[in-house]
């Protein structure tokens, strides 16, 4: 499902401020596998997620997702790749605060070419999965932190992505809401989704549905 071969990422390359964020990353993740990227802040796990999401490009190396080479995609094709294959749950939610929950959830489908009724059906299904359907018409700015996270999950799932990427998904949640989020992840795992979670929360490493914990330190995978 996800293959990284000899991936490097250098910021400010060719300058005195050059910083090697990732070095010699080789990683294969199977379809349907749930993987934890573990490490302290600055270890490279969020950078790695951004490359898999085609939000940034590697300095060198190859990244293949579901048979598609995504490491050198032009920006337009990268947007199409994200809209088709992946859902991303960000640490800070990245929601449109003045819109309702439903309006936020349908954002990934705006340019899909689907009918309004189909879009609404897909949004309703996704909100139900994320246990936020009862707040569909409520403004996002009125939600609690846990509710905002569930809205972000519903938005990430609305287009039925094959791959789900989560970047420090419980960093802004209390323990009760963190456990609710984990329940949703377990449900997605049973549906056969491929899930990659970047976190330093030790709670994730103990979950029965997690296939592997990959430890990162100073931009490399520790073995």
Where are these regions (language model features)?
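ABC ATPase NBD coupling module
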Residues: 70-87, 190
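Conserved ABC transporter NBD signature motif
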Residues: 61-69
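Catalytic Walker B motif of ABC-type/P-loop ATPase nucleotide-binding domains
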Residues: 164-167
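Helix-to-loop junction immediately C-terminal to a conserved catalytic motif
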Residues: 53
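Short coil-to-helix segment of the ABC ATPase nucleotide-binding domain corresponding to the Q-loop/switch region
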Residues: 99-107
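Conserved catalytic motifs of ABC-family nucleotide-binding domains
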Residues: 160
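Conserved ABC ATPase signature
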Residues: 139-143, 147
């Amino acid at each position: 499902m996800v293959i990284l071969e000899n991936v490097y990422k250098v910021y400010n390359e060719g300058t005195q401020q050059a910083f090697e964020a990732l070095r010699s990353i080789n990683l294969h993740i199977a379809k349907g596998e749930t993987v934890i990227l573990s490490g302290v802040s600055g270890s490279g796990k969020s950078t790695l997620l951004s490359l898999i999401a085609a939000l940034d490009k590697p300095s060198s190396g190859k990244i293949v997702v579901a048979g598609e080479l995504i490491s050198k995609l032009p920006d337009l094709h990268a947007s199409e790749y994200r809209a088709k294959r992946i859902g991303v749950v960000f640490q800070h939610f990245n929601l449109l605060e003045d819109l309702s929950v439903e309006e936020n959830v349908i954002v990934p489908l705006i340019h899909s070419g689907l009918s309004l009724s189909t879009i609404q059906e897909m949004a309703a299904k996704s909100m139900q999965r994320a246990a936020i359907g009862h707040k569909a018409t409520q403004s996002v700015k009125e939600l609690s932190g846990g509710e905002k996270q569930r809205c972000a999950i519903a938005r990430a799932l609305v287009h039925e992505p094959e791959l789900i990427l989560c970047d420090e998904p419980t960093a802004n949640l209390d323990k009760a809401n963190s456990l609710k989020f984990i329940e949703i992840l377990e449900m997605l795992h049973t549906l056969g989704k491929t899930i990659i979670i970047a976190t330093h929360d030790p709670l994730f490493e103990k979950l029965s549905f997690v296939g592997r914990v990959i430890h990162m330190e100073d931009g490399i995978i520790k073995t």
